[in-house]
From Swiss-Prot:
Record: residues binding ATP: L6, L7, S8, G9, G10, V11, D12, S13, L33, G123
CDD domains in UniProt: MnmA_TRMU-like
NCBIfam families: PRK00143.1, trmU
Active site: residue positions: C100, C195
Protein name per Swiss-Prot or TrEMBL: tRNA-specific 2-thiouridylase MnmA
Site feature location: Interaction with tRNA: H124, Q334
Amino acid sequence: MKIAVLLSGGVDSSIALYKVINKGYTNIKCYYLKIWLEDELSYIGNCPWQEDLNYVEAVCNKFNIPYEIINFQKEYYNKVVIYTIEELKNGNTPSPDIFCNQRIKFGAFFEKINEQYDLVVTGHYARIQIKEKKFFLKQAKDKIKDQSYFLSHLSQEQMSKLYFPLGTLFKSEVRQIAKSINLPNKDRKDSQGICFLGKIKYNEFIKYHLGEKKGNIVEKETGKIIGIHNGYWFFTVGQRRGIKLSNGPWFVIEKDLEKNIIYISHNENYLKQAKRKFLVHEIHWINGMPSDFENFKIKIRHGEKKYSCKLRLITNNLIEIFLNKKDHGISPGQFAIFYKNTECLGGAKIFKIIE
């Protein structure tokens, strides 16, 4: 069996490689996908992928596995970055990691390697189960690290080629294995944030593409201007950190795109703005539309928290969702991901908040 392993330079993908080697497979090749954007890097003054590559090389040397670097900068810009920028301009909250997986890691990469490999292995925390020749996406054993949210838009064809060795492990176990075999990157910290940014600050990326535009920060209850911001695209509804005003905590509760105004409120008043009913479209089902929507739960952001909910099908591409509890951070552009027990069924894009 021929196996391709995607290495990022981090501990997770390195242990995924180790687990495959431990199963006795020998026909293995590793790949590092280069998606850094040269213009941004020269603007910000970093070369963050060099450290990744150093670790990739060190890990491959340890296991005597060949590796190759594949450049997907153009594909990433066209298929993920443009989407992200447009969502921000429209005042929405983008989810680029969902499309990074669907369109690049398991899209452009699959097209590039074509039929060369029987299996593609990554360090994602998720599980794939096969039943009656269908592939089902399941949450990882480690619910804190579970990445099914970001994998929710994969197709049957993509899933048929994938193997996630870390789906049955806790992160603590992964760290223990890394130390026990003395991995070169055993002490490397986990990466945070969007897949293509790495050490680049998200706001620097936004500033590069959309610039800055001064606007007022207004207290919702009083209408009083209490600060100045650099552009509505730097803020998301529900945001608490980064507002940089005294007498906090403050929360972003509304954005006026035309007037470039950010409305904020203190915690007690802000929670009154919590919502529970909204519409989603651009729906993707991993195994086709379910026969019923009973006992569904959804995530509206990456993390452990799921909501019980009621779903009402309006059309095949429009669903009304009613949460059992209100949430104070629902924003257009986010993705609502559907679950039944531990199975991830797919997801859809939030486009209108009702109440």
